[in-house]
From Swiss-Prot:
Species for this entry: Burkholderia cenocepacia (strain ATCC BAA-245 / DSM 16553 / LMG 16656 / NCTC 13227 / J2315 / CF5610)
This protein's name: UPF0301 protein BceJ2315_30870
UniProt cross-references to Gene3D superfamilies, sorted A to Z: VC0467-like (3.40.1740.10)
Gene Ontology CC annotations of this record: cytosol
Family to which the UniProt record says this protein belongs: Belongs to the UPF0301 (AlgH) family.
Alphabetized Pfam families for the sequence: DUF179
Transmembrane segments: none
């Protein structure tokens, strides 16, 4: 049994799905881990845009969004848990405090309260953000087990991949942080 000090904390890491990922929900995904502890893990898929854009989502929740560059930004599938709930991964806003925010080691925040969307709608919110519906969640030890079965690669997250890289390029960009590409990966695990 490992001591708490022996645990690896994967908060602020990318999980990159391996080709042998058994769960089709996560095939080809990059997950940003917002929280990882002995109780489990919570993350957001960052490379699965949906057909919903900010304008239509804001209309659904009775918020007026008139900032033209934001209207057609896609909302992302964040994972299969709580898919009716919004999760906003964003850079902190100096002097702002949102009702349900969690600071992530590495400088980002995840907010689940509507007030961050109200701030976005008025132009006072975070300038760089990613909005998801749903999140990915793992119980105690579940993620570690999936990693040990070669289901995921892990690498320190880079906010430029989250916010500045087109969604369809995020998987390869995250792999690039490890110095590999998808063509170098095999769906078979082996031992020398």
């Amino acid at each position: 049994m490992s001591k708490p000090s022996d645990r690896i904390n994967l908060t602020n890491q990318f999980l990159i799905a391996m080709p042998n990922m058994a769960d089709p929900t996560f095939s080809g995904t990059v997950v940003y881990l917002c929280d990882h502890s002995e109780r489990g893990a919570l993350g957001l898929v960052i490379n699965r845009p949906t057909d919903i854009d900010l304008e239509s989502l804001f209309n659904r929740i009775d918020l007026k969004l008139d900032i033209e560059p934001l209207l057609h930004i896609p909302v992302y599938f964040g994972g299969p848990v709580q898919t009716e709930r919004g999760f906003v991964l964003h850079e902190p806003v100096e002097g702002a405090s949102y009702n349900s925010s969690m600071s992530v080691d590495g400088g980002l925040e995840m907010t689940t309260s509507k007030d961050v969307l109200e701030a976005v709608a008025t132009g006072t919110g975070p300038k760089r953000f990613l909005l998801t519906l749903g999140h990915a969640g793992w119980g105690a030890g579940q993620l570690e087990e999936e990693i040990s079965r070669n289901g995921w690669l892990t690498v320190a997250a880079d906010p430029r991949i989250v916010f500045d890289t087109p969604a369809e390029e995020r998987f390869e960009a995250a792999l690039g942080l490890l110095g590999v590409s998808s063509s170098m990966l095999s769906g078979e695990a082996g031992h020398a």
